Amino acid sequence: ADLDELRDFFAFIREADILPQFILYAPEDVIRFNQLVRDGVIPGEKLPVLYVLGRYTTGQVSDPKDLLPYLDASPFVSEWMLCAFGAHENACALTAAGLGGHARIGFENNHLLVDRSGAVDNAALIVQAREGAYLMGRTVATGDQARKIMQPQW
């Protein structure tokens, strides 16, 4: 990748007040992200990231413990979210909630409820995660809260 072009791109989105989405699929991606921030290619002090669990595993299956290598791996992360592939999506989402993160849930990653039955729609997946989050003392973000979570500290 041409780092000068990438630096220019990130300068543009910063100036245009576009919310970037930094998607990290593996702990190695966090190392690369850290280096790009240190080198000034990605501007900012604290940036929101999305950790993806299970995308490149056999059968696209995630496990809550897959999150552990990501935690505290970057001094440049302000808020973090995760999404998780497979039947353990809800367990991963609740693990994130319990550890201070946020979760993104959806049919693009999983179609199964925690009882392994098929979800009739995306809302069913969200409802079960919301109920679990409430039991942990967490709430579901409003649209405005979600935009704030995703706001980089340039």
Q: Which positions does each model-derived feature cover?
A:
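C-terminal helical cap(s) of enzyme catalytic domains, especially alpha/beta-barrels
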Residues: 114-140
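Short secondary-structure transition/capping segments
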Residues: 34-36, 115-119, 153-154
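Short, basic/aromatic-enriched C-terminal tail that caps enzymatic domains
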Residues: 143-154
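Gly/Pro-rich active-site loop or hairpin
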Residues: 60, 108-110, 116-120
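Flexible, glycine/charged-enriched surface loops at secondary-structure junctions
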Residues: 23, 136-145
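Catalytic alpha/beta core domains of metabolic enzymes, predominantly
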Residues: 1-108
